[in-house]
Amino acid sequence: MSLLWTPQILTISFVSYILSLFPSPFPSCYTSCWFETSITTEKELNQYFELAKFLA
């Protein structure tokens, strides 16, 4: 669990920072975009760690 915690926080911070740079006329999109990004990232991280465990 601790392996995913730090990358998730970094990803969330990065996404929030990028979104704050580009004001959108549709603020409600931020939430759905944020969820899609975090879910995709979590799946990719899980696949990466599974591969790392397999190779180790």
UniProtKB/Swiss-Prot annotation:
Pfam families: Hyr1. InterPro entries: Cell_wall_rpt. May be associated with TAP2 isoform activity. This is Putative TAP2-associated 6.5 kDa polypeptide. It comes from Homo sapiens. The lineage of its organism: Eukaryota, Metazoa, Chordata, Craniata, Vertebrata.
